[in-house]
């Protein structure tokens, strides 16, 4: 499971709130003899550095919405290397609240859905 934190796309970080503490999820996944989960939190650029867009930026060779690219790269990294820390790169669920939930929805629909995604489940909360 990977988590994308919220914060209105302008604030936050992977360890910056109590909702980011995975201990309850991990304990619940091990209850009753369950094998548990691997929990990975990611960071991404925020504010103007993460979400600038427009024709002037693109004409100057800039990348619009770099925060989404940061997230996509991190998700792809988790899928590629999950096996190195006991996970299954073919069984990734994204969890996110607020801007994190919205980001999950953006990842699903990015590129008109033509590029696909490297995760198999999504839990967008209050996007």
What is the meaning of each model-derived region?
Residues 1-127:
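Serine-hydrolase-like catalytic core of hydrolytic proteins
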